[in-house]
Amino acid sequence: MTDTPTKNENQSKADNLPPSNPNDQRKGNRNNDRKRNRRGDSKNERDSEWQERVVQIRRVFKTVKGGKKMSFRAIVVVGNEKGQVGVGVGKAGDVIGAVRKGVSDGKKHLVRVPLTPNNSIPTLSKGRDGAANVLIRPAAPGTGVIAGGSIRTVLELAGIKNVLAKRLGSKTPLNNARAAMVALSQLRTHKSASRERGISLEQLYS
């Protein structure tokens, strides 16, 4: 049978423990605050890299049992102007909620765009979505972004400064934006194109 410590013995052990230093507690709290601030700062820096532009907001109606239910649909283009861009669609009962969902959806559908040293695209490319067809081609430095509507927004947020774009077919902003995304997703650098075709860069240019 083991002897259990009495209440007086426990009290004497507690009395022998060194007193806690309030400075140590403050240091621990400051360290935790610094870690939280660093995490918050890094998240804010990542968010500040991205820009979003609303292409279109429209009211949509859904027929339900009690009548028609109205909501808002927002088409948003998200990009960091460094070769990444995405198009998102959000629906909600209010405009702010629809835009927020559109931004989140756009970040889930990002496309990487290979940029040339003069902030253009390496080759000509075509894209199609529904009845919309988009043709984009590289341009010389100083040309600017020759495009309109949602196509221009996509190209600018991708970081392209010199490009020519032509819209064929549908004028719907969503279809044109998605067609531009398809065209950008098909772009390849000269080096990757020569590697895929199994030829040298000199043969590619000749």
UniProtKB/Swiss-Prot annotation:
Biological process annotations from GO: translation
Biased composition of type Basic and acidic residues is found at 24-51
Protein origin, superkingdom = Bacteria
Can you supply one Gene Ontology CC term for this chain's record?
A: small ribosomal subunit
Repeat is among the record's keywords: no
Keywords in alphabetical order: Ribonucleoprotein, Ribosomal protein, RNA-binding, rRNA-binding
Gene3D superfamilies listed in its UniProt record:
3.30.160.20, 3.30.230.10
Similarity comment: family membership: Belongs to the universal ribosomal protein uS5 family.
The function of this protein is:
With S4 and S12 plays an important role in translational accuracy. Located at the back of the 30S subunit body where it stabilizes the conformation of the head with respect to the body.
Domain notes from UniProt:
The N-terminal domain interacts with the head of the 30S subunit; the C-terminal domain interacts with the body and contacts protein S4. The interaction surface between S4 and S5 is involved in control of translational fidelity.
Its recorded name reads Small ribosomal subunit protein uS5
Q: Which organism is it from?
A: Prochlorococcus marinus (strain MIT 9515)
* Chain's gene name: rpsE
